Curated annotation (Swiss-Prot):
Protein name as catalogued: Immunoglobulin lambda variable 2-14
Main subcellular location: secreted
Chain spans, region Framework-3: 74-109
Species of origin: Homo sapiens (Human)
Entry superkingdom: Eukaryota
Keywords: Adaptive immunity, Cell membrane, Disulfide bond, Immunity, Immunoglobulin, Immunoglobulin domain, Membrane, Pyrrolidone carboxylic acid, Secreted, Signal
């Protein structure tokens, strides 16, 4: 079972925004049913490292993205506790424990940024 990991692109104007930052995720992460995996999301002190506003989304093919984690480690109501978020320095992580077949999806991270630079 493998996941293609894509960067969520959120573009807005101005300084202090949910702008697209150069967040780096691994190209793919794989695991077997029952195992745990961790997906990293590395930014800078202007985004991931500077604010506790990292979110994670899950997207199945043909479906809208689903918010899984917000503000680094909070789960919305209805999201399984098999999903957990954390942050250390400029890197945020999403851990999925007890992998299940339905966890196969694209996972996206996003972060608030204080940078006024928009990356294309």
């Amino acid at each position: 079972m493998a996941w293609a990991l894509l960067l969520l692109t959120l573009l807005t104007q101005g300084t202090g925004s949910w702008a697209q930052s150069a967040l780096t995720q691994p190209a793919s992460v794989s695991g077997s049913p029952g195992q745990s995996i961790t997906i990293s999301c590395t930014g800078t002190s202007s985004d991931v490292g500077g604010y506790n506003y990292v979110s994670w989304y899950q997207q199945h093919p043909g479906k809208a993205p689903k918010l899984m984690i917000y503000e680094v480690s909070n789960r919305p109501s209805g999201v399984s506790n098999r999903f957990s978020g954390s942050k250390s320095g400029n890197t945020a992580s999403l851990t999925i424990s007890g992998l299940q077949a339905e966890d196969e999806a694209d996972y996206y991270c996003s972060s608030y940024t204080s940078s006024s630079t928009l990356h294309s």
